[in-house]
Amino acid sequence: MELLLLSNSTLPGKAWLEHALPLIANQLNGRRSAVFIPFAGVTQTWDEYTDKTAEVLAPLGVNVTGIHRVADPLAAIEKAEIIIVGGGNTFQLLKESRERGLLAPVADRVKRGALYIGWSAGANLACPTIRTTNDMPIVDPNGFDALDLFPLQINPHFTNALPEGHKGETREQRIRELLVVAPELAVIGLPEGNWIQVSNGQAVLGGPNTTWVFKAGEEAVALEAGHRF
């Protein structure tokens, strides 16, 4: 399988997806036809989100079609060489994808050679479940099971920092709560600017920041760029 799982879409001082474009270009391998799944978008319309994505990827020669715009979404997925899933609200993304019957076809197409690109909520969707999203559950997705393309759980936008005076839980504390009730899971705390690239059977960590892996009953393990999962 070929996956590019990004923690986020924007870095300070850079344009939207700017930091990801070289990664995407490197993994295209001649692929040009893409479908975009915009359902995580809530405060922007799906048309706006699709057009924005198409515009930024056009210089790479990628032709982007919004899955919500086609008459036969399953046929579009079958024909796609690239499947792109944007960030936003993960619960909304999973709900719409499940109700439209897209989860199994997307997973199957990626397993048969399509490149999967997802940022934030799109990275969450590639995991076994969405239980490590940071998002508010604004809708009920009728279950948390997701695409299960990547075997570990990802927590995107990971930071353990708290504003001065803030008394809420740290991100690690929230992840530890999950590991109490689901000790079989391993969770990757993927900070902004980092990514996981899967190609030729290898999953490799990239990015400038320390990534953390959390497992039940164990201390967090720090990982740096180049680590192979």
From Swiss-Prot:
Its main location: cytoplasm. It is an enzyme of class 3 (hydrolase). InterPro entries: Class_I_gatase-like, Peptidase_S51, Peptidase_S51_dipeptidase-E. Pfam families: Peptidase_S51 (PF03575). Its EC number is 3.4.13.21. The keyword Glycoprotein does not apply. PANTHER family: ALPHA-ASPARTYL DIPEPTIDASE, PROTEASE S51 ALPHA-ASPARTYL DIPEPTIDASE. This is Peptidase E.
